[in-house]
Structure formats: C-alpha cells, structure tokens
C-alpha cells in the first residue's frame, strides 16, 4: 500500500486545514497509508546548523524519504505560503550530501500535491506560490489542487463544512495523487 505523508501548514489546534486533511484521509481510506508530519520543533533554516543536521531535521528527512507522496494542506498567510511550511521545505529540499548541491534531497522527485482552506472564497494566490516553488525544488507535482473558502459561520463554530462538490474534488485529487505514485 502506498504511503502518503500529510503536511498541515497550520500549527493551530483544530485548524481548518487539519480538518481538510482529515477529510482527505477518509478519501484515501483503504487505498493508502496516511501519516501526519510533526514539524513544530524544526528550527529556522540556518546554514550554520546544516551540517550535521539538527535531530528534528534528520527525523523529517527520514519520514519524507519513507513516503511515496506528500500532500500539503496550506492556509494562506498574507497571500503566501505560511512561514512554517516554507521553512520545512527549505530544510528538506537541500541536498542530503552538501558536497553535491544538485544531488538527491528528501523531496527530489517526490510526488506532491496541495490543498488549502483560506479565508474568503479561494486560495488561488497561495497555489501560485506552490506551483512555482514545488517544481523548483524538484518535486513531481500533481497539479489538481483543491481550494476551499471558509464560510463566515465557521469562525464561530470552529467547524469546516465541505459541500458534496468539494468532497468529490478532494476525492478526485486523492485518486490523481495515487495514480501519479503508481
């Protein structure tokens, strides 16, 4: 069974993007093994710390290397990628052997996709950033992204409610991700 690693770009307890990831996990049930990356202890990227890599970074790299695919669930912060996700991608896109900068990284040739819950109607702005960044760091992107706007009521209830259309879109994205692995 394929292994899909979820990266939730919001560290907030009960985040809407974590709720979206839970729905995606249901879409992958019986088709893939899902795990969630815990990266809250990763330090800010700093070349002075790069070699040897901090233990938290080494652990991240191992988890990413063990996965067949990466699925990022990203909020939109100021129309861009959240800093914690960018930091994670900076660490894990670096060559594993620093004497060979174009050599393999934890993310090189890794299949990946992105979904996002954003305030307002659409996370298109953050998708532009991912569509530029992920190929640059040599990932194989499944460009069938799912975007969900937060309903104003969700801020009061804390609950993300997806329409049948959005659930179908998420399921189709899951199938496309699995097809890209195999």
What kind of region is each of these model predictions?
Residues 29-35, 139:
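A generic structural motif
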Residues 2-31:
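N-terminal beta1-alpha1 ligand-phosphate binding loop
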Residues 35-38, 143:
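A structural preference for short, hydrophobic beta-strand core positions in alpha/beta folds
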Residues 5, 140-182:
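Glycine-rich phosphate/pyrophosphate-binding loop and the adjoining helix
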């Amino acid at each position: 069974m394929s292994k899909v690693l979820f990266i939730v770009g919001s560290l907030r307890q009960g985040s809407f993007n974590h709720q979206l990831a839970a729905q995606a996990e249901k879409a992958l049930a019986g088709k893939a093994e899902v795990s969630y990356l815990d990266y809250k202890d990763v330090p800010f990227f700093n070349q002075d710390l790069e070699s040897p890599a901090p233990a938290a970074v080494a652990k991240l790299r191992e988890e990413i290397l063990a996965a067949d695919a990466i699925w990022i669930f990203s909020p939109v912060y100021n129309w861009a990628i959240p800093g914690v996700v960018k930091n994670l991608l900076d660490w894990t896109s670096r060559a594993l052997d620093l004497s060979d900068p174009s050599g393999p990284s934890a993310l090189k040739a890794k299949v990946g996709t992105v979904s996002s819950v954003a305030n307002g109607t659409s996370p298109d702005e953050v998708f532009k950033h991912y569509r530029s960044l992920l190929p640059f760091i040599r990932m194989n992107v499944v460009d069938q992204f799912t975007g969900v706007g937060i309903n104003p009521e969700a801020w009061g209830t804390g609950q993300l409610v997806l329409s049948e259309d959005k659930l179908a879109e998420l399921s189709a994205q899951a199938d496309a991700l699995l097809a890209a692995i195999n």
